[in-house]
Design a protein with these regions (language model features):
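Sec-dependent bacterial lipoprotein signal peptides
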Residues: 1-18
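Ser/Thr-rich, Pro/Gly/Ala-heavy low-complexity intrinsically disordered linkers and tails
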Residues: 20-106
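Disulfide-rich extracellular modules and peptides
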Residues: 22, 32, 37-38, 44, ...
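Glycine-centric low-complexity/flexibility signal
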Residues: 94-152, 172-175, 181-417
């Protein structure tokens, strides 16, 4: 990924050799939220902008001291029953509430985990891509497989620093079970993209009717794939010249999700034209963060769905993947201004056309990480049509792909699920959840 600097109209003053001179402000160009620094999103004009109005940043633990989270955590209300006493004496604070679908009495916490730079963790291999970013934490030695196939990491504490991120990948969902306090100032991301499967993102076969179906083939113009469903329904795939678009993935019954740890469903592939149809976007993964003490979030915890691929010549665009699951539970939950907990759907891919030199449709955007706005569908090539937007914010359903005389656009993926649970909760007005979610008691 390369960032380009572009000059903006604003002017700031710089002091050079004792003299005050004017210099242009700069902003980073972007194609999506992942291209921007923390606490910024990809805004109008494809430039990185602040996600929320600036607010005082909470104190951050000092790097290089894993295991000191209880002392460095800037939580408030230590005299209000925060079960963090005794950490210095080798005791693990017990949970004063029952975390969802977790038998915490069977888990023994290991050392604290500190994420100090950008890396990823694979629930299949149980390894960090860059072990140095995890400050020497041996996840493979402490990981536990739960009865539902979830990989759990029992921890004494957790810190994700503001200039660090942890991408969560692999076939199995992940549960971070913290017997103590946790601070997330950087990013925890279980989302999917065209290159990465988020941890626990299910296969088409696992999703059943909640997966988008494939568009019909037609060398004169194929149908787009349907968007994946999860908390809501995906978008319809757009029709091609004489080919129907794929059906959207259905919303899952929320009653069946009360304790399950599972991700969002994939979009259907676009039908084949003269060229191939676009691939369906993967659904977001499943992340469960349970903290016995105080959890303070000023960064990002997310599980967006992946965007659908653009169709080849006269091929249909792929449907976007649905957002996944972000379940956060704590004794005391604090969401600071600038915090973002998101599970947005991916945009559908654009349809292809064989009349233009650039015959491929564009890929749909992945679900937004730090905003409640819809991921854009990919543009269609030439006379072909674009994909539908992903579900986000108060619009949880994916938008339908457009019909076309060439390749139809893929439907957008639905939004996923955010769960916030706390014995006590502090949610700042500048904190964001998408889809919108309120904190509830256990």
């Amino acid at each position: 990924m390369q960032w380009q600097l572009q000059a903006l109209a604003g002017i700031t003053s710089l002091v050079v050799a004792g003299a005050c001179v004017e210099a242009p402000e700069v902003s980073l160009s972007c194609q999506g939220d992942r291209d921007c620094p923390q606490h910024q999103v990809c805004g109008e004009g494809s430039l990185c902008v602040d996600a929320v109005p600036a607010s005082p940043a909470p104190a951050e633990p000092v790097k290089g001291t894993p295991g000191d989270e209880g002392e460095a955590d800037p939580s408030e209300g230590e005299g209000e029953g925060d079960p963090s006493e005794g950490e210095g004496e080798g005791e693990s604070p017990a949970f004063d509430f029952p975390p969802t679908n977790l038998e915490v009495d069977t888990l023994v916490p290991a050392a604290s985990l500190s994420i100090v730079c950008d890396t990823s963790f694979d629930t299949g291999t149980r390894l960090f891509a860059d072990p140095s970013c995890a400050a020497g934490f041996d996840a493979a030695a402490v990981a536990v497989e739960l009865p539902d196939g979830t990989v759990a990491l029992p921890l004494a504490g957790l810190t994700v620093f503001s200039d660090a991120s942890l991408a969560l990948t692999g076939r199995a969902p992940l549960a971070l079970v913290v017997f103590g306090n946790a601070t997330v100032a950087g990013a925890l991301d279980a989302g999917s993209s065209s290159q990465v499967r988020g941890a626990g993102a299910p296969d088409l076969a696992e999703c059943g009717a909640s997966a988008g179906t494939r568009g019909e083939n037609d060398d004169g113009g194929a149908g787009g794939g349907g968007g994946g469903g999860f908390a809501d329904q995906g978008g319809d795939g757009g029709d091609g010249e004489q080919a129907a678009g794929g059906s959207p993935g259905a919303a899952l019954a929320t009653a069946g999700l009360a304790a399950a740890r599972r991700g969002g469903c994939s979009g259907g592939g676009g039908g084949d034209g003269d060229g191939g149809g676009g691939a369906g976007g993967l659904g977001g993964g499943a992340l469960h963060l349970a903290v016995s003490g105080t959890l303070e979030v000023s960064g990002v915890i997310s599980s967006p769905g992946g965007g659908g691929g653009g169709g080849g010549a006269d091929g249909g665009g792929g449907g976007g993947g649905a957002g996944g699951l972000v379940r956060v539970e704590a004794g005391h939950l604090i969401l600071r201004n600038g915090a973002a907990l998101t599970a947005n759907g991916g945009g559908g891919g654009g349809g292809g056309d064989d009349f233009c030199l650039g015959s491929d449709g564009e890929d749909g955007d992945d679900g937004r990480l730090r905003a409640a706005t819809r991921a854009a569908g990919g543009a269609g090539a030439c006379l072909a049509t674009g994909g539908g937007a992903g579900g986000a914010g108060g619009n949880g359903a994916g938008a339908s792909g457009d019909d076309s005389g060439q390749g139809g656009g893929g439907g957008g993926g639905a939004a996923g699920i955010i769960e916030l649970v706390g014995l006590s909760c502090e949610v700042a007005p500048g904190a964001l959840t998408s889809p919108p979610t309120s904190c509830r008691a256990p």
